[in-house]
Amino acid sequence: STPTHADQLAYLGQWFYSYMRLSAPTTITCEEPAPFAVGTPILLGHSARRHKLVLNILVDALPWNIVRTHFSEWMPNIARFFSNGTIFDAHFSTSEYTYPALPAIETGRYAHHTQLFQADASHELSRAFLTLGECMKDLGYYTAAPILTTDSIYNGTMRGYDRLISTVWNQPSGIGAERAIHHIEAFGEADLFTFLHLSDIHPWDAMGFNFHTAVETHLPLDQRLFAWEKATASVRLPDFEIYKAQFRAGLRDVDRNIGTLLSYIENHYEDDEYIVSLYSDHGSSVFTPRRDEDPLDIIGENSTM
C-alpha cells in the first residue's frame, strides 16, 4: 500500500525476484506468515558526472598477440566498433589463469597483494582493497554482472555489484549479449556499470567436453582424431589443430553476438554517453608449439597477452 493507493493483493511467485516501480513510500507485507526478501532500491536518474553506460566485456582466454594480426578478419563486427576507439597492443595479464587474474583486474593489485591464487586454498579479498564494482557503486552507478562465473563471488572479487547472475562452467556470449540488452532495457533510466564474463573461446580438455559441431564436421580425420589420455589443465593444453579450430569457432560466436550488443548500444546512445571496454584475463597455450617433452612456458606471451 501507499499513501494514495489502497491495499492490493498480488501473487509474485516463488524462488525468484520480482521488480516493482515505486514513486512513493510503499509498504509491502506478506499475507502468509512467511519470510521474504526485499532488495536495495534502484534509484533512477542520470548525472552529468557519470556516463549512462559503462560496459566491461571480459572475453576469457583471448590471446591478443594471436588475434591482433587477424582482428578485422576474425572479429569484423567488434573490430569495426573499436576502430573508432583505442586499442592496446602491449597490455599483459598478471597471471595465466582466471582465478588470480580477475582479482588483479578488478582491484588493480598484483596477485602477491590479493593473495588469491587457488580456490581450494583461498580466502576473502582483503577489505583494504576496493574493487572496481565498489568504486563505481560509490560514484552512483547501478552495478550489475548479467553473466559471470561463480568463483569470483566467494572470494570477494565481485564486491560492490548490486546484481549478479552467475553460472558454472559455461558463459556463452549469446546469452550474455541478450541479458545485457535486457538489462539496459530494464534499468536504462539509471546510470549503468555492467560487466560481462564470456567463456566461448576458453580452451577445455578434450576429455571433458564435445567440440563445436562445425569444428568436428570440417576438420580432416588426421586432425579430428588424436591420442590424448591424460586429464590436462587448460593452461597446459597442447597445440593440437582441433583446439585452434575450436578457438576460432568460439571467436566467431563472440563477434556475432557481441557485435549485436554493440550495434544496439550505438543505436540507443550518443557517442559521449557510453564507454565500452573489451579485454581478457589471460591468453591460451594452444598456440604455443612444443614437443611432448618440452616444458610449457606458462608466462609466455601466448598465455599472458
Describe each model-derived feature in a short phrase.
Residues 1-305:
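Catalytic domains that recognize anionic headgroups
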